[in-house]
């Protein structure tokens, strides 16, 4: 087992890539805190993990609140006796347009994609250092590696995630903490359907979300969306000791989109 007896947190783990990751990590021997805003999804993911013989707790939390971003670390460490890794997977597409920008949606994109992850990191670092090191993983996007004309705000915050992680990697390497970023391309999740059909994206109004998903996914060289499990596989590698000499990396898992 690649994560035997490791203790970790996965945010936005109620569905999609986050859930696939939490389930996979538990199968590899980790004790996992499943964090999501949706309590029903949290319960469902925990049941899936425990039914397969894994160990998990569920934490329902709105990570826009700094106190909650810290609480998930405290509750995980108290329940399992420490912390070895965090996958900061939470995200929000934000506004599609800068013209007439919805500033509340802009603030939400910053809070969920960047601020909450920094606050969770602040809380997690002492726990990781106390165990001699660990792994921090962040979800950015291909939009955090190359600008997206359809999502300038999303690109901005995801570039911020990549920049933060790379800088932090240099700062905490001496403490045995590795810091990496995973950059998915179009992935077959509920989030993708929200992303392609945002109400302020004029070109998509009135179109079938499934048609939009197929169109977006077909733009990569492999001609299909990623499966959540494929993103989880890459996350597992970066979190595990198999990536023991990898830090400060931003790994595209995108079917060749950024090649």
Language-model features, listed with the residues they occupy:
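Substrate-binding pocket helix/loop in short-chain dehydrogenase/reductase
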Residues: 97-98, 102-110, 216
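Short, small/polar-rich loop/turn modules that mediate ligand/substrate recognition or access, typified
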Residues: 87, 173, 178, 246-248
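C-terminal substrate-recognition "lid" of short-chain dehydrogenase/reductases
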Residues: 2, 80, 118, 222-253, ...
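Residue(s) in the substrate-gating loop at a strand-loop-helix junction
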Residues: 141
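Active-site helix of classical SDR
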Residues: 121, 157, 165
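Alpha-helical segment proximal to the catalytic Tyr-Lys
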Residues: 126, 170-171, 244
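Conserved glycine-rich cofactor-binding loop
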Residues: 7, 14-16
């Amino acid at each position: 087992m690649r994560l035997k007896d490791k203790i970790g947190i996965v945010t936005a783990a109620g569905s999609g890539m986050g859930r696939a990751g939490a389930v996979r990590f538990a199968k590899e021997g980790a004790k996992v805190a499943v964090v999501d805003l949706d309590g029903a999804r949290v319960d469902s993911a925990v049941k899936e993990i425990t039914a397969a013989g894994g160990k998990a707790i569920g934490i329902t939390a709105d990570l826009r609140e700094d106190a909650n971003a810290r609480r998930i670390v405290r509750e995980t460490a108290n329940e399992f006796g420490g912390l070895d890794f965090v996958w900061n997977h939470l995200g929000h597409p934000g506004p599609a347009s800068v013209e007439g920008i919805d500033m509340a949606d802009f603030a939400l994109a910053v809070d969920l994609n960047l601020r909450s992850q920094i606050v969770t990191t602040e809380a997690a670092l002492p726990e990781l250092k106390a165990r001699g090191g660990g792994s921090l993983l962040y979800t950015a996007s291909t939009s955090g590696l190359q600008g997206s004309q359809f999502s300038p705000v999303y690109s901005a915050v995801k570039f911020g995630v990549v920049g933060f992680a790379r800088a932090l990697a240099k700062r905490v390497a001496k403490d045995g903490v590795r810091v990496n970023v995973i950059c998915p391309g179009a992935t077959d999740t509920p989030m993708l359907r929200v992303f392609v059909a945002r109400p302020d994206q004029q070109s998509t109004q009135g179109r079938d979300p499934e048609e939009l998903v197929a169109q977006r996914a077909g733009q990569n060289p492999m001609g299909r969306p990623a499966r959540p499990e494929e993103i989880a596989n890459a996350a597992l590698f970066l979190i595990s000791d198999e990536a023991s000499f990898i830090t400060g990396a931003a790994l595209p898992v995108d079917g060749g989109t950024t090649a």
